[in-house]
Design a protein with these regions (language model features):
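Phosphate-binding/switch loop-helix module in NTP-utilizing enzymes
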Residues: 89-150
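Conserved P-loop
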Residues: 25, 30-95
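Phosphate-binding/switch region of NTP-binding enzymes
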Residues: 154-214, 224
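Pre-Walker A adenine-sensing motif
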Residues: 6-18
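Structural beta-sheet core signal
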Residues: 55, 152-154
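NTP-binding/hydrolysis catalytic cores, primarily Walker-type P-loop NTPases
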Residues: 1-8, 109-111, 208-224
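Short glycine-/polar-rich loops that comprise or flank the Walker A/P-loop
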Residues: 49-52, 84, 149-150, 171-174, ...
Length: 224
């Protein structure tokens, strides 16, 4: 199976080349763990290769996303790519008549997309009138987006587990969690792969996840 590079060379190596092509990956974690930056880094990796990429934000505005990226050396080219191979779509939560189905319809207005990031899945629950309805429409959305041939990352704030508590981890092909851990009384970020269909990986082994002035990278340290 062909692979899609993640934007983190060491993570690509651990996963045998990257995420399996045309899969849905849930990236969960608490506030400040790096979910948004992980998603944008994934898109910039593809956009630089000429792949069509779209970041769908239910939180920050496009201006806020760009400002966050420009704080890191390896992500400063974000503005040059917008309007060419990268789009940032902001969907306001107060928008009337919004539903997950209409949400997907908005995405179909773009030319064929190779990579999509949706941030934040927790907010999508507001588009449904029940938990059951959300699960059904969420599953339908994933099937549709995979069917058109795109690789999808969904960012989500975890609810004490590895997803938001509405079964998203079950529906997605892969699950990565970002978190803060204490190592010798020093707080550090970590990345853990909990699930990844069609690929071998170190199951549930936390790896050091570094965010510095240069950008994002996976460290050599395994946190055991």
């Amino acid at each position: 199976m062909s692979k899609v590079t993640t934007g983190l060379p060491r993570l690509d190596k651990l996963l045998g080349g990257g995420f399996p092509d045309r899969t849905t990956i849930l990236v969960s974690g608490g506030p400040g763990t790096g979910k948004t930056l992980f998603g944008m880094n994934f898109l910039l990796e593809g956009a630089r290769k000429g792949e069509k990429c779209c970041y769908v934000t239910l939180n920050e505005t496009p201006e806020e996303i760009v400002r966050a990226c420009k704080g890191f050396e390896r992500m400063k080219d974000v503005e040059k790519l917008i309007g060419k191979s990268l789009a940032i779509e902001h969907i306001a939560l107060g928008e009337s008549n919004m539903s997950i189905k209409r949400f997907v319809t908005l995405l179909t207005e773009y030319p064929k997309l190779d990579r999509i990031v949706i941030d934040n899945a927790n907010k999508m629950f507001m588009f449904s009138d029940s938990k059951k309805g959300y699960r059904i429409h969420f599953s339908e959305m994933l099937r549709y987006l995979k069917g058109i041939g795109c690789s999808l990352i969904i960012c989500e704030t975890e609810d004490g587990g590895i997803d938001g508590g509405n079964g998203e981890a079950f529906e997605c092909d892969g699950v990565l969690s970002l978190s803060f851990m204490e190592l010798e009384e020093k707080p550090m970020r970590s990345l853990t792969v909990h699930k990844l269909r069609y690929s071998s990986f170190d199951a549930k082994v936390p790896h050091e996840f570094i965010i510095d002035e240069a950008g994002l990278k996976l460290g050599e340290t395994k946190i055991i």
